[in-house]
Amino acid sequence: ALKYRDKVLKILKEHASESDITERSLSKAEYFSWINNTNEGTTESQTLANLNFFEWLRQEYGMQLDIYAFDAGLIDGKNIYGSINSQRFKNKFPKGLDSTYLKAKQNGVRLGLWGGPDGFGDTLESAEERKEMLVSLCRNYDWALFKFDAVCGPLREEKEDLFVDMIGECRKYSPDLILLNHRLGLKKAEQCATTFLWEGKESYIDVNSFNTCAAPHNRVGALGRGLVPDLKRLTEDHGVCLSSCLDYWEDELVLQAFNRSLLLSPQIYGNPWLLSDREFPKLARIFNLHRKFSGLLVDGIELPSAYGKYAVSRGDDKTRLITLRNLTWEPQKVKIVLNHEIGLEECKHVKCRLYHPVERILGIYNYGESVEVTVLPFRSMLFYASADESLDGIGVEGTDFEIIKDVAGKPIEINLLGFA
């Protein structure tokens, strides 16, 4: 693990990304379509149906997606490079990308793409055609993300200069273009990458991510993932799979969004429409809370071992968001000390509440006091402590609750869960 960490940090230091994105850039909420489609690729009608779903989440619950990324098969596929001028692409998208782009733009969403890093062919003409195709996505469609994957094939060393030049042209039109390096052995072209795939590992539950111990649900292996090297946010953890094994997905998403809080967070993929109707408010709530606190989540510290495994506190000197987890069969009590230990500077009073697994207003405490919380077996927790009253949100004292709807200009809906 230490060898892997040192290797990653060396790469990050030697090849700082030449984009407008830094370690302190705000996160982007992303969905990518892997498992909704696989290497066969998606279609225009399928994509528009998916975008309609996210439009509904936005209108109903205020959930805002930043990036909708096409996964494998839109243009490139496994071991093949394609073209938007091919008959294969035209059969799937008879109107090109115009309708999809306009639908996404109407909802404040930008598009992204899975593909391979090469595809330049062996002639100047083929190289220019490949370059123009990808640059045109940025020029014409305000492209947000390229995920280049070794599954499609490597980047030939003699083509690295072409690649660097192409990405430079792309960023003239999309300065904040995110380039994900998925297991590519890049050399000179590494300077173009925004993130790397943490541990080279994907997160499809029970396929790429699985339990290594007896547990009551299938996501314990995912909950047990550690912390990225030095809490570097320009890392990609492949997000949270919403397709199979849907129990306790929210615990994993809380850790993805608030514990690691990477550049792409919250990040989901698969088929979120398979969630039950009662779960959509929770999905939106996690996205909405992350957006509300996004400016605070760029800075984090790892907490002492007394807080449990991989506990992290994020925020500034007035407000902290703390993520805890329990990977055992017994409830674990944790004392959260409201002082510099969690990153709070001295103040008079601190307001505390839970956001997950339930919402609960815990009360107002003096600086330096401790708040004892109980983390349930094989669950995560999101705890909030703040001396900044301007960040206070709605809630109900004396009972656990969940926010169903909190959309500007619409009635607020709260579900009361029972008195504490």
PLM feature segments, named:
Residues L362-E413, L417-F419:
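C-terminal beta-strand-rich structural cap/linker in extracellular carbohydrate-active enzymes
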Residues N36-T38, I75, F120, W329, ...:
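Generic "edge-of-domain/loop-turn" microfeature
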Residues A49-F53, M133, L253:
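Well-ordered alpha-helical segments embedded in enzymatic catalytic cores
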Residues D165-I361, E372-A385:
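Active-site-proximal substrate-binding groove within the catalytic cores of carbohydrate-active enzymes
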Residues L9-K10, T47, L338-N339, G398-I403:
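Short intrinsically disordered coil segments
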Residues Q64-E252:
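Aromatic- and carboxylate-enriched substrate-binding clefts and catalytic-loop regions
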Residues A1-D118, E128, W273-P304, R314-T319, ...:
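Conserved structural scaffold segments of CAZyme catalytic domains across common CAZy folds
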